[in-house]
Amino acid sequence: MSKSLQAIRGMNDILPEQTPLWRHFEGTVARLLDNYGYRQIRMPIVEFTELFKRSIGEVTDIVEKEMYTFADRNGDSLTLRPEGTAACVRAVLEHGITGGGQVQKLWYIGPMFRHERPQKGRYRQFHQIGVEVFNLDGPDIDAELIVMTWRLWGLLGIRDAVKLELNSLGTSEARARYREALVEYLSARLDQLDEDSQRRLKTNPLRVLDTKHPETQAVLVDAPKLADYLDDESRVHFEGLKARLDAAGIPYVINPKLVRGLDYYSKTVFEWVTDQLGAQGTVCAGGRYDGLVEQMGGKPTAGVGFAMGIERLVLLLETLEQVPEEIARQVDVYLCAFGEAAELAALALTEKVRDQLPTLRLQVNAGAGSFKSQFKKADKSGALYALILGEEELAAKVIGVKPLRGQGEQQNIAWDALSEHLASCVVQG
């Protein structure tokens, strides 16, 4: 096939065999967020480039290397969103929904775009679910976000495979003092740093802490610690968060090198990580960004949020074999009809069943075919039961119900009793 007719490298099709697990995951998250009082917001996938330069930071890897940026026909510089927080802040500012101190607890879902090197768990188009809260500045809301994700891991059956890492970045003033001390320490050891860290030292020194280079990591062992430069306000906030996590029974580790890759974070930052996915171990991350709204032209507004990568979490569910059987099975009942009269009767009968059992996944054979071919398709569909309607069943106004996944003989069920029978053996288990 011509390359121009293939998916772009790092941007993948999600095929019908994969979507049931995606829908299961997305539905589980959506129900949880609804239960906690969060409301969905939907933003465009394209924004003015300046939005991300102002919010993420011009000297970050995302802005410098990874954004998909282009000029439209009006000459405006536009960018496919690389993350969701900046777009969400822009939306709440544009529509004034945080004015007057209104608390907003929002969530969104959709694709993000970064021109990174594709590998397992990292793609150029990837999907995130993000949560943002505005006008709440206490550690209680930070804790709620983490407690909520902890509950999600329990619902998905993956708690034992993830670990919570925490840090506090302090206020911008505290970070400035720390940055000065870190630069002084690293500048004296410049020849021991890898090339990328030398560049970051000039543009974004805190990102050196995030290095994966062994020699630079060795240099950082004796580097100044951010915790020693925290302001009192941030220290009290962080202690309040830890106390709440302890009360909720959520285990965590303090990672003093956790700084996140975006300039807008302050105070709390956190990541949920796993060792089950190789190098791409972060499955959910977030933190507080109290200065971002003001930085983007609004009034001082507290903000905190997180984003989780759907691809990585779906991959983790598959790796841990936490895919519910009913998710893997896309069809409950498959109906085989033989002859035009049976097909017409089947149409009326199945629609009546759907009226009475709206959650039943009932597939009707299309394209006619012999008994053998239809039954083969019924078996291949993964259905629990095949319904059989031929001339004899039509004359007697019954339908054959044959188990496909277990013991038991075929039964003939009267049409009027079909819904009740399927409810007892399929819907109610």
Swiss-Prot record:
One of its GO terms (cellular component) is cytoplasm. Pfam families: HGTP_anticodon (PF03129), tRNA-synt_His (PF13393). It catalyses: tRNA(His) + L-histidine + ATP = L-histidyl-tRNA(His) + AMP + diphosphate + H(+). NCBIfam families: hisS. InterPro entries: aa-tRNA-synth_II, aa-tRNA-synth_II/BPL/LPL, Anticodon-bd, Anticodon-bd_dom_sf, His-tRNA-ligase, HisRS-like_core, HisRS/HisZ. One of its GO terms (molecular function) is histidine-tRNA ligase activity. Keywords: Aminoacyl-tRNA synthetase, ATP-binding, Cytoplasm, Ligase, Nucleotide-binding, Protein biosynthesis. PANTHER family: HISTIDINE--TRNA LIGASE, MITOCHONDRIAL-RELATED, HISTIDYL-TRNA SYNTHETASE. It comes from Pseudomonas syringae pv. syringae (strain B728a). Its EC number is 6.1.1.21. Homodimer. HAMAP family: His_tRNA_synth (MF_00127). This is Histidine--tRNA ligase. One of its GO terms (biological process) is histidyl-tRNA aminoacylation. Belongs to the class-II aminoacyl-tRNA synthetase family.
